[in-house]
Amino acid sequence: MDDNKKAMRKLKLHVAISIDGCIAGPNNEMDWIDFTWNDKLREYEDRLHEPVDTIILGRKMTNEFISYWSNVMNKPEDPEHSFAKKMIETPKIVFTKTLNKSEWPNTEIATGDLKDEIIKLKSQEGGDIIVYRGASFDSSLIKENLIDEFYLFINPVAIGNGRTIFKDLKEIRKFNLIESIAFDSGTVLLHYEVKKN
């Protein structure tokens, strides 16, 4: 690679998904997700998030995300405590058309065209960028082919009817498998990168 040409930042999707391809029930139910926090999962999450310095969120997901991790961070005995600290301290960008300024600490607002904003963000100096579950937001990112790596935590459950993230694709997308890890809960992590043409 040309030394003068810097690499783009990677955008990673981190999501729990059922074996029938749903990330939430029809009314956003998530009680079927098993994310048992043990040493193996903690070590993996720490490794995954180590190069990440920006979190992006859709507006609908933001309150829930920040509220959950803020509550965990206030419980030092919680096994997720150290991870929660990283979630709260990592700068966040919320994509919204309804807000002009942030309601949350350590958070900026992005109101422009999604594709333009993400391309601009990926071209800036910095570490990797990560996005979490949010069916409509994730679907938009996937449709625009903006996600570089997928971290799919396949839960051993089929829910039959729910919200998916690949339904808006208009063409076949192919991926390279980078890693797979089975956890004691039966959840399997599949780490894919988008296959370049």
What do these predicted regions represent?
Residues 2-197:
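Enzymes that bind and transform nitrogen-containing heteroaromatic metabolites
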